[in-house]
């Protein structure tokens, strides 16, 4: 951690650190006189698909160093674990210290190539009704330039979701905030990848 944090170009106090997997993590304090506070809400149209960025998903190779960094140093709290196979852990969700947003660790045992990293690392946007959100996207003029299908699926976490990819291949996940049956999915107890 730096001894002193500087002010960024838009007036917020910030600094960067690198996590154990090489991801740059920017720590930001929104200042009262910053562009962020001054312009809050001005560029958000009523036609937007989402009003809340729920989480960011990042690839993690070894769970213990990531837990030490995000939990022990930054104060994130684990609240759910999931497994795609039922044999080895796939995800660990870590809530920020002072809110409901979270970081999703996506665990791997074999390092992914650059193309896989781009489709795995992602931003998740909450939408209250995934069917309505997808219908809105399908009706937009820009849809004719987006060649991939937009499919609604139910994730291991029991929530309906759809994935889109920006022109660089980065995944954008749209997800409903609640499970399909209104009950939380029990966390997985299987071991992390080796």
Locations of the language-model features?
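Vicinal oxygen chelate
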Residues: 1-52, 58, 80-84, 90-95, ...
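Eukaryotic phosphotyrosine signaling hubs
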Residues: 54, 120-121
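Short hydrophobic/aromatic beta-strand micro-patches
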Residues: 59, 124-126
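Amphipathic alpha-helical segments
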Residues: 62-80
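Flexible internal linker/loop segments at domain or repeat junctions
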Residues: 103-110
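Short amphipathic alpha-helices within nucleic acid-binding modules
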Residues: 130-137
């Amino acid at each position: 951690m730096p001894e002193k944090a500087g002010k960024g170009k838009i007036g917020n106090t910030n600094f960067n650190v690198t996590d154990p997997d090489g991801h740059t993590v920017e720590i930001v304090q929104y200042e009262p006189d910053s562009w962020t506070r001054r312009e809050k809400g001005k560029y958000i149209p009523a036609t937007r698909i989402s009003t809340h960025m729920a989480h960011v998903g990042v690839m993690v190779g070894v769970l213990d160093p990531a837990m030490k960094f995000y939990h022990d140093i930054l104060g994130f709290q684990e609240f759910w674990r999931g497994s795609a196979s039922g044999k080895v852990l796939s995800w660990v969700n870590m809530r920020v210290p002072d809110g409901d947003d979270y970081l999703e660790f996506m665990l791997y045992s074999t390092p992914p190539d650059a193309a896989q990293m781009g489709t795995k690392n992602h931003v998740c946007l909450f939408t209250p009704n995934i069917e309505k959100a997808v219908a809105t996207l399908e009706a937009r003029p820009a849809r004719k330039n987006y060649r991939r299908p937009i499919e609604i699926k139910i994730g291991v976490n029991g929530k309906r979701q759809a994935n889109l990819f920006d022109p660089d291949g980065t995944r954008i996940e749209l997800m409903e905030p609640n499970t399909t049956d209104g009950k939380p999915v029990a966390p997985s107890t299987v071991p992390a990848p080796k």
